[in-house]
């Protein structure tokens, strides 16, 4: 009997889940609150309650070769980093190519998801939905939650004494759409994440004054990396990951900080993280350093107190006559349709095995797709998550015991806290995490075997960027075009930029990218031995 799967949300996680259910012979039904697919990437001029929202000028932070669905490369002429409308175009192309739209019920709200009385034996769920004021109930063999984590804005007003006295306007960055109304205004942006930096940089060209207040600082990276290549094509590699995880901590931290400071010294710009060794996801902004250098954006410490029209910072300085306060303070994740006892949260900690499965469930028929954050792109991550989840739901890939899953969660949590800090406990190392998931379903590339049988491909897989195609080389859902996609990925990267041909477009030397850090590390270790 074919298993029926309810999928909540038709963003990238939902589409990946629909597609992978179909590949494995399951029967998906996707419930989408809005009128279209795309989730976060579907721009709207107005904010809808219960839906993710972006501003008009949002661009991707991951390049196209690292962002695509693993068997559906972006068209050659698409830019490497793209406007949200361009990514939405690609998402629509994917959904139509894979014939996914007919499995989606639009304008449908999921009201509740509850275990059936016989859940211990069947693993089934009662799902109640609402459309046009009419409620319906249906039974599903499994549920995949794909509603994202950019829905419920976090506005910690209790952390800012006097904010209730402030007479200007204050709102969350989720409500920001475009800069027009801020012309000639004085704006305080609280938060140094991607949204805060994007908004501050955009407003700096039209507002009278823009200040960013940051409690802990952040690394700020450019999308343009060494020799002009996209940052992630050089930064996210298997060899880079190997070095990062095997070198002595003092060397690894030193090299990481050197990479982060390669473009500019963060101390000089007031951006340096309080704990500079944490591997928190950096901010991606090509404009902010120039805005600071030109004096059109100012960085300040945390706000100590608000008055009726001013903000007093912890260093004693005051920003007066503020018109707007924008809280770019992130989001809280919540599942209002689900009993809290199923997915427990401790502080900012989610109790999910590999960020997907709640360990205590008697039957592993509930999966959360797209909650985990990593330095890698969301699309390939959610694709691999849903591939594994589908195998678990089918019963072909059993989970470990509850005890083993909880031990794994606790072990990983300790490592995450050390690497990323307490506020980013759903963050994880991209390559390590992807390999873990891939190994569960036999989709992890066998690097030693590749070097023996296909050295040309092996060099690209190990020393080149860890592109999504690598996870469709083998295993269920393997793609015959994966090898060629890997060997031609640099051609697609260069294609949209060669609009004025001057000589031959140059691909990077893979060995040069890793030889330098190895050499520096060896010299550093030798120096430490000599000195101590």
Curated annotation (Swiss-Prot):
Names of required cofactors: FAD
Enzymatic class: oxidoreductase
GO molecular function, one term: flavin adenine dinucleotide binding
GO cellular component, one term: endoplasmic reticulum membrane
Catalytic activity annotation: trimethylamine + NADPH + O2 = trimethylamine N-oxide + NADP(+) + H2O; N,N-dimethylaniline + NADPH + O2 + H(+) = N,N-dimethylaniline N-oxide + NADP(+) + H2O; hypotaurine + NADPH + O2 + H(+) = taurine + NADP(+) + H2O; (S)-nicotine + NADPH + O2 = trans-(S)-nicotine N(1')-oxide + NADP(+) + H2O
Residues binding NADP(+), per UniProt: 60-61, 195-198
Keyword Endoplasmic reticulum: yes
Pfam families: FMO-like
EC number per UniProt: 1.14.13.148, 1.14.13.32, 1.14.13.8
Domain of life assignment: Eukaryota
Gene Ontology biological process terms in this record: taurine biosynthetic process
Modification Phosphoserine, positions: 401
Chief subcellular location: membrane
Functional description taken from the UniProt entry: Essential hepatic enzyme that catalyzes the oxygenation of a wide variety of nitrogen- and sulfur-containing compounds including drugs as well as dietary compounds. Plays an important role in the metabolism of trimethylamine (TMA), via the production of trimethylamine N-oxide (TMAO) metabolite. TMA is generated by the action of gut microbiota using dietary precursors such as choline, choline containing compounds, betaine or L-carnitine. By regulating TMAO concentration, FMO3 directly impacts both platelet responsiveness and rate of thrombus formation.
Pathological association: Defects in FMO3 are the cause of a fishy off-flavor in cow milk due to by an elevated level of trimethylamine (TMA) in body fluids.
Protein name: Flavin-containing monooxygenase 3
Gene name as annotated: FMO3
